[in-house]
């Protein structure tokens, strides 16, 4: 992610510590050196992205890429997706859903709420690691808009 103005920050919302380490390690292996800001629950992530008042003004001017697990301990990833995509300050931030759920209705719901990419976590370690490396290569060439 080669940006002239501000570097893109990757916000990773993933409650499984093993998955979070695997995701970060393989994004790094793909040559992506952007800051990764990890959260293990939706409440802390939304507080960071939307602020304590929920207005989202705290994200204004930032370039954010969000990696979102759907199965979190305190709320669903769908709730987070809906809040971020309906907020004027975060609606343009790309959201990549990374989850174990491969239910076609759930996939459709995520796209309906504005997910940009939906990736099913493979049970097989090597397959999942390879998918994340490929995602990292995608990150290295994509453009991310600045939040309003």
Regions found by a protein language model. Give the residues of each.
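A short, hydrophobic beta-strand element within the central beta-sheet of small alpha/beta folds
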Residues: 92-102
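Short, glycine/charged-rich "phosphate-handling" switch motifs in NTP-dependent
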Residues: 116
